[in-house]
């Protein structure tokens, strides 16, 4: 009994003594490992197409972060997907921001907009969701593009955008060759 108690106490001590970044939950998709930002929760993907899914709760409002990877030469180009994502927010043309970032060998395209989000599968029925926002990222790799998309109420997405971008850029570094 004393041994079990000692092991439990030691485990708790070690877990709390480690820096937060070493204790952080991670999500692995293909060659990338993403540290889940504090306050975000990893949940079971709601679709088999999703490789991982996170939830961000800010009071009663929730946003979701979804990860997709379809393989080499699958899922379309970064430009095609950014255009499709923006089309899910009709009338948002003046609020669209696209940024390109290079992290080692990984090209990242960030796409952000806000307005009424037409939620649903492409070509299927949609549900208009007013006051929503998008912050998406596409990581281009030889094994196929990785698509990461955060959608939810505008306030939640805007408050989470910096953490989202950090998660994505830090995750891109995990697949970059070590110098």
Where are these regions (language model features)?
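Structural recognition of the beta-strand scaffold that forms the well-ordered cores
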Residues: 66, 109-110, 146-149
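Surface-exposed amphipathic alpha-helical segments
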Residues: 40, 142-179
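Boundary at the C-terminal end of the N-terminal hydrophobic targeting segment
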Residues: 17-24
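Solvent-exposed, acidic/flexible segments
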Residues: 47, 74-78, 128-131, 141, ...
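Secretory pathway targeting signatures of secreted, lumenal, and periplasmic proteins
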Residues: 26, 30-89
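Bacterial N-terminal signal peptides
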Residues: 6-17
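Signature of long, low-cysteine stretches enriched in small and polar/charged residues
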Residues: 38, 49, 82-139
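A mature extracytoplasmic/lumenal domain signature
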Residues: 38, 46-47, 69-71, 112-117, ...
């Amino acid at each position: 009994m004393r041994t079990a108690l000692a092991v439990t106490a030691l485990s708790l001590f070690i877990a709390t003594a480690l820096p937060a970044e070493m204790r952080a939950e991670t999500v692995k998709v293909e060659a990338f490992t993403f540290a889940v930002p504090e306050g975000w929760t990893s949940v079971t993907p709601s679709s088999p197409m999703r490789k991982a899914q996170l939830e961000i709760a800010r009071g009663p409002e929730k946003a979701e972060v979804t990860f997709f990877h379809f393989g080499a030469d699958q899922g379309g180009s970064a430009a095609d997907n950014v255009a499709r994502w923006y089309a899910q927010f009709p009338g948002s043309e003046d609020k669209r921001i696209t940024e390109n970032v290079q992290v080692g060998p990984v090209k990242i395209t960030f796409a952000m907009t806000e307005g009424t989000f037409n939620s649903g599968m492409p070509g299927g029925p949609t549900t208009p969701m007013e006051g929503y926002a998008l912050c998406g990222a596409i990581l281009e790799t030889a094994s196929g593009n990785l698509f990461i998309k955060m959608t939810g109420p505008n306030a939640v997405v805007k408050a989470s955008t910096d953490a989202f971008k950090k998660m994505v850029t830090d995750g891109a570094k995990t697949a970059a060759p070590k110098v």
